[in-house]
């Protein structure tokens, strides 16, 4: 229910859902919640499933358009149109066709909310509707939000700075020109608060910012919240809209982005021998996560189960990666162990696949270490070849791609992969999507700062068989 809704008489609510025990048994409510929270102590973790998905991405708003783009092998990378990119080394990006008015945002929301927050809320609304949850039967205190972002409200902060400083010419800030919403832009935790407000979540609400693994880690944190019993429903995912002059210049300075400006559509080429950096992008994905038993009891459509998750830091270098892939391999092993999935049962790997020289080399080594010879039999692909790298959001978009791959039995391709690299010698599904029965898939992320995360997802049929 909305946060400002009037209290509802429990007797008038009719049948209750699996998320809210009958109010006439208050003591039993506490017992049920304690039972859920104590399952972990006895090795009976609550299983977590995805029952709703929402996507806003370059080349596609909503899961249908997103999936059509991924399976077509087309790319959404173009010359930057948001501003004149000619002064910059990298002049290409993957911009989303996002109209906040068409999305239903009113004047007050448009005035208050940064573009990244709008993406997150739009995705949360889509996921909520797709989940089939009835807001009137949810206990708001048992609903939470876990949102990730790498640069949060960078778009609005940069705009406000330009206004305050006369485009950088005046270094004295005149408070009279300051937007009354500057606080909303400055404090990253406003983003999950906006989502909580939109969906009526009064449970645990957290902000995750672990660079390019934020989208994986925010969902992983939400899984933990349900497993430990502190929430029954979590809205989880990530949003980033980093296509701004300062962010573009930032990655220019460290030579992380591509300089293939004369061929934007083919600029993002993970694992290709001619790769020269990633393509900056924007996007968001949000999920509704629930306890498996509760989702089953209400007859929900289960898209996938999140059966394992792990994250770690290599404590090595802010941007550098060791060529042997040891730390990422260990992260993968921990996720597989938690999932109780053997390496030989992984049917597809959704790679981080950023398109930088060192990352793709590092990943290839990690898959060989973690999966052994099975790595050579497993298709690996990078959707960044088509939708670019949306920093903190990409991990959630890649989870969405895995969910859709499991449901459709199709592996998305790695676009633009035409030139082999002897150090990247696995099956990277070049150019064309591939039909394949998928039961268990692995998705990984790697971020500046040494963050490395991995997640195992299972299809609904396999999840049911494991019950």
From Swiss-Prot:
Alphabetical keyword list: Acyltransferase, Antibiotic biosynthesis, Transferase
Ketosynthase family 3 (KS3) domain mapped to chain residues: 45-459
Q: What is its EC number?
A: 2.3.1.-
Give the record's GO CC terms.
cytosol
Provide the residue span(s) of the region labelled Disordered: 1-35
| InterPro entries per UniProt | Beta-ketoacyl_synthase (IPR000794), Ketoacyl_synth_AS (IPR018201), Ketoacyl_synth_C (IPR014031), Ketoacyl_synth_N (IPR014030), PKS_Beta-ketoAc_synthase_dom (IPR020841), Thiolase-like (IPR016039)
Pfam families named in the record: ketoacyl-synt, Ketoacyl-synt_C
What Gene Ontology molecular function terms does this protein carry? 3-oxoacyl-[acyl-carrier-protein] synthase activity
Q: Member of which family?
A: Belongs to the thiolase-like superfamily. Beta-ketoacyl-ACP synthases family.
- What name does UniProt use for this protein? Actinorhodin polyketide putative beta-ketoacyl synthase 1
Lineage here is:
Bacteria, Bacillati, Actinomycetota, Actinomycetes, Kitasatosporales
């Amino acid at each position: 229910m909305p946060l400002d809704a009037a209290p509802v008489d429990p007797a008038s609510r009719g049948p209750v859902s699996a998320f809210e025990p009958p109010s006439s048994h208050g003591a039993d409510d506490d017992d049920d919640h304690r039972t859920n929270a104590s399952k972990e102590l006895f090795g009976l973790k609550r299983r977590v499933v995805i029952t709703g998905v929402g996507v806003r991405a370059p080349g596609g708003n909503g899961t249908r358009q997103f999936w059509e783009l991924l399976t077509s092998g087309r790319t959404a990378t173009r010359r930057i149109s948001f501003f004149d990119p000619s002064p910059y080394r990298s002049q290409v990006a993957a911009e989303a066709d996002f109209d906040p008015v068409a999305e239903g945002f009113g004047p007050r929301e448009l005035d208050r909310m940064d573009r990244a927050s709008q993406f997150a809320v739009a995705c949360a609304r889509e996921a909520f509707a797709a989940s089939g949850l009835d807001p009137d039967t949810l206990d708001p205190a048992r609903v939470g939000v876990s949102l990730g972002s790498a640069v949060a409200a960078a778009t609005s902060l940069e705009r406000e700075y330009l206004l305050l400083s006369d485009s950088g010419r005046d270094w004295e800030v005149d408070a009279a020109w300051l937007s009354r919403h500057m606080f909303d832009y400055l404090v990253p935790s406003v983003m999950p608060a906006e989502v909580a407000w939109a969906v009526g979540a009064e449970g645990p609400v957290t902000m995750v910012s672990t660079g390019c693994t934020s989208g994986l880690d925010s969902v992983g944190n939400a899984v933990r919240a349900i497993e430990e019993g502190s929430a029954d429903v979590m809205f989880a995912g990530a949003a980033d809209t980093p296509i701004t002059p300062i962010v573009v210049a930032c990655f220019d300075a460290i030579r992380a982005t591509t300089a293939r400006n004369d061929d934007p559509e083919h600029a993002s080429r993970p694992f290709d021998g001619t790769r020269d950096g990633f393509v900056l992008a924007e996007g968001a994905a949000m999920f509704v996560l629930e306890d498996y038993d509760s989702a089953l009891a209400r007859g929900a459509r289960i898209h996938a189960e999140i059966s394992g998750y792990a994250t770690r830091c290599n404590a090595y270098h802010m941007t550098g990666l060791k060529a042997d892939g040891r730390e990422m391999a260990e992260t993968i092993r921990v996720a597989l162990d938690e999932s109780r999935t053997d390496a030989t049962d992984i049917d597809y790997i959704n790679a981080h696949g950023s398109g930088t020289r060192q990352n793709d080399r590092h990943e290839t080594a990690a898959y060989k270490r973690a999966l052994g010879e099975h790595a050579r039999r497993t298709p690996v692909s990078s959707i960044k070849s088509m939708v670019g790298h949306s920093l903190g959001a990409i991990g959630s978009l890649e989870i969405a791609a895995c969910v859709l791959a499991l449901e459709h039995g199709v592996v998305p391709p790695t676009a633009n992969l035409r030139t082999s690299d002897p150090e990247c010698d696995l099956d990277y599904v070049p150019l064309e999507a591939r039909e394949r029965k998928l039961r268990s898939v692995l998705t990984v992320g790697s971020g500046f700062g040494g963050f490395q995360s991995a997640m195992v997802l299972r299809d609904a049929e396999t999840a049911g068989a494991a019950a």
